[in-house]
Amino acid sequence: MQTIEVRRDSGQADEDSIVAFERGAGIRFPESYRELLLAHDAPRLKCPDFKFVDRSSGLFTIRDVAFFGFGSSLSRSNRIVDAQDSDGCWHEHIVVFGTCANGDYVCFDYRRDPTANEPAVALMFHDYPDNDGKMLVNLVADSFDEFLSLLHRAP
C-alpha cells in the first residue's frame, strides 16, 4: 500500500469488527483497505480529493472522501455499519466505505464478482438516479490501490 498522509483519525479499527462486518455483508475487503483502517479508523486525509468521469454528463468531476470507521465510539453518521443501504435505493453488492462533502458515497463495487477481494471503487450519486431508479454509480478506479493513487489536494 502506498503511503497516505492522514490528517486525523479515531484510533485504530479492531480486526474483529472488520471481520464481523465482512461476514455480515458476505464480502472480503481489499487488503490495503484493511491495513489503512487497522492503522487509522475513520481517517480524514490530507489529500482527500479525486477526479472521475461523471456518467450523467460525461465530464471530469472532482469529489473528496471521508472514510467511515468501525469504532463503537464513533457517531452513527461515521460508522460503516450504519452507512449501508436501508431504503432500497442502492444496487446489490455495493458496500459504502466513505462519503463526500456533498453527500455522495464512495463505495466498493462487488457487482461484477461478489467474491472478489479487489473490487472496483465507485462513486454513487445520492441525488441522481439511474434508469432503474437506483443511485447512479460511477466507476472511479479498478481497485482500492488505484483509488489511493488518484487522491490529491484540490487546487
Where are the language model's segments positioned?
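A surface-exposed partner-binding patch
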Residues: 1-104, 152-155
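Intrinsically disordered, low-complexity segments enriched in small/polar residues
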Residues: 31, 103, 108, 142-145
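N-terminal leader/targeting signatures
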Residues: 63-66, 121, 140
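Segments surrounding the PLD/"HKD" phosphodiesterase catalytic module and close analogs
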Residues: 108-136
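Glycine-rich, aromatic-bearing surface loops/beta-hairpins
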Residues: 131-149, 153
